[in-house]
């Protein structure tokens, strides 16, 4: 298998879900070997957020709906082995491991048949073992969204996300500045705010 690179550039995943009335419980696991290390693998160099030997992600979540409201909690653990590059900010990584523990709680409420609101809080703890020391950054993220139906197919929405990163003494691996995915780029400070306003039409 080594001659074809199958063992190196592969990905496999599995997931389960249990539903009982208003209760939903789910779990998933993903494993990638050769993350972003080639142009033909499961996760190619131009699509991988991080270039590394391996990436393992395990997660579980629970959701409960009651009346017009719903609340959910999600936990994920990511273990990246031998990371060499942070593609999100084009920074070099020289560590032996990069790990993230992510905790999110979110909720939604249907105020009227036309208007719904959503909110979330996310906390991520990182652990990056580098050749010049260990850094343990933390990310705090808060998000709000409102959606209003203009018709069965058309709605207008507004959403905002604020992120703050702490625990990084210097620019280790490009992690000192806040970075919300979907923004124009990384902030030059430890905080970032992103606001979206959109009109959507479903065909």
Roles of regions detected by a PLM:
Residues 13-148, 159-163, 201:
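Detector for outer-membrane/organellar transmembrane beta-barrel domains
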Residues 152, 160-178:
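C-terminal beta-signal and adjacent terminal beta-strands/loops
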Residues 114, 150-156, 189:
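Short loop/turn motifs that connect adjacent beta-strands in outer-membrane beta-barrel proteins
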Residues 150, 187-203:
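Outer-membrane beta-barrel "beta-signal"
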Residues 133-134, 185-188:
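Short proline/glycine-enriched turn/loop segments at secondary-structure junctions
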Residues 176-186:
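Low-complexity, intrinsically disordered Gly/Pro/Thr-rich segments
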Residues 1-19:
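Aromatic- and glycine-enriched pocket-lining scaffold segments that form the walls
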């Amino acid at each position: 298998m080594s001659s074809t690179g199958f063992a190196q550039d592969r990905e496999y995943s599995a997931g389960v879900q249990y539903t009982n009335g208003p209760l939903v419980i789910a779990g998933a696991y993903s494993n990638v070997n050769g993350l972003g290390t080639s142009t033909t693998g499961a996760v190619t160099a131009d699509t991988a957020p991080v270039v590394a030997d391996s990436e393992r992600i395990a997660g579980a979540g629970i959701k409960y709906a009651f009346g017009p409201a719903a609340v959910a909690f999600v936990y994920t653990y990511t273990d990246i082995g031998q990371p060499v590059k942070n593609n999100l900010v084009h920074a070099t990584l020289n560590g032996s491991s990069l790990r993230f523990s992510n905790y999110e709680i979110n909720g939604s409420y249907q105020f009227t048949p036309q208007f719904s609101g959503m909110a979330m809080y996310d906390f991520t703890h990182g652990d990056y073992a580098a050749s010049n020391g260990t850094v343990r950054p933390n990310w705090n993220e808060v998000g709000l969204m409102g959606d209003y139906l203009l018709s069965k197919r058309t709605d207008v929405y507004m959403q905002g996300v604020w992120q703050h990163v702490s625990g990084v003494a210097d620019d280790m691996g490009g992690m000192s500045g806040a970075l919300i995915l979907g923004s124009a780029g990384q902030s030059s400070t430890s905080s970032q705010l992103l606001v979206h306003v959109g009109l959507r039409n479903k065909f």
